[in-house]
């Protein structure tokens, strides 16, 4: 509620299933009232694939939440935006976003009556559990070489770190969602969301790492 008073656009990243938990079932109404943009993870439009990747029961819960968000106007009203996120289930780059988005929209609407605004096909960044998987399977070097070869300088102007600020659960500020996972706070004196109520964060040096190649590969991932 507080940050929406100061930010022109507020976006929240969600795995959807958390919004099916009784303690959080009123959150979608809050998002609607504040016009919060929702970025929701849905690994695939097929139950078998999603349940294999995320666990049994995740897909039907995700569908239930998406249908509820549609009922609230998300994906239908101009100022209630919901975008879905696709990640490859392995050490490879995502397919072309435009074609995949068309398939997602057709499958979800035909099978469940679900509508959404856009699909983001995001490259798996070599951080967190995915990094652990790559090292465990001895795939890290090969995967990084894929990212290096797919580097596209045309993606740089649209990177999230150049246009947005990510806020951690404790209010700490990060250049992007991936730096949040890596606990790489923004550079400069302003480090907490409470400071943004008094002054703008201004120009700063973006903190980077090897994981940044995930956002600059192919058509870009942020």
Please annotate each region the language model reported.
Residues 1-24, 28-67, 83:
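Core AdoMet radical
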Residues 28-30, 157, 204:
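Short secondary-structure boundary/capping segments
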Residues 46-160:
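Radical SAM enzyme [4Fe-4S]-AdoMet core and its adjacent flexible, acidic
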């Amino acid at each position: 509620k507080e940050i929406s008073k100061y930010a022109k656009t507020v976006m929240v990243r969600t795995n959807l299933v958390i919004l099916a938990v009784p303690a959080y079932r009123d959150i979608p109404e809050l998002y609607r009232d504040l016009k919060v943009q929702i970025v929701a993870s849905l690994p695939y439009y097929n139950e078998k694939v999603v349940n294999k990747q995320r666990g049994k029961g995740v897909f039907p819960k995700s569908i239930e939440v998406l249908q509820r968000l549609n009922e609230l106007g998300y994906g239908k009203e101009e100022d209630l935006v919901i975008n879905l996120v696709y990640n490859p289930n392995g050490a490879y780059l995502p397919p072309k976003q435009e074609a995949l988005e068309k398939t997602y929209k057709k499958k979800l609407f035909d099978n469940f009556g679900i509508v959404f605004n856009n699909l983001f096909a995001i490259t798996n960044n070599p951080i967190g559990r995915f990094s652990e998987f790559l090292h465990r399977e001895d795939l890290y070097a090969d995967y990084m070489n894929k990212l290096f070869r797919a580097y596209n300088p045309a993606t740089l102007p649209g990177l999230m770190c150049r246009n947005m600020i990510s806020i951690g659960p404790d209010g700490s500020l990060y250049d992007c969602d991936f730096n949040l996972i890596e606990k790489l706070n923004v550079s400069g004196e302003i480090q907490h969301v409470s400071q943004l109520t008094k002054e703008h964060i201004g120009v700063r040096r973006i903190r980077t790492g090897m994981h940044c190649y995930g956002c600059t590969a192919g058509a870009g991932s942020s």
